[in-house]
């Protein structure tokens, strides 16, 4: 008798492997989305805290503005000292040298959702009283979302999928 596998045994093994992969793929994709979101939220939180630290050491009012390009699937933030000229992070070359502006550019596969986009400010931070205007926005990676909330006492909080309706327009 010859040793080896029959065609039927090979097909059964292939079928079992296919079923296992079909069950594992959604879980793997979900964890991949979660990793993308966590990485981006850590970088964005660090940027916002760095800007808050700059504001605390100044007596100026700073604006934080969000810009996004839906066709290019990209977004960015501008943090700048209050000035009559507002800088757009999607067109940084249009920002004059005398305006102190800092830009944050997102990684791929994430989107920012807010009710206010450039030229409107997302929030304003005051160095005199260490306060912020109350505002929020959502960071999204596919179906995974994180809410960023600024409170008037100057704090910044992150929440997972809570109270999104106050920060998201209905048409998005």
Residue ranges and their predicted role:
Residues 1-29:
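N-terminal single-pass transmembrane signal-anchor helix
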Residues 45-50:
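Phosphate-interacting basic helix/loop segments used at nucleotide- and nucleic-acid interfaces
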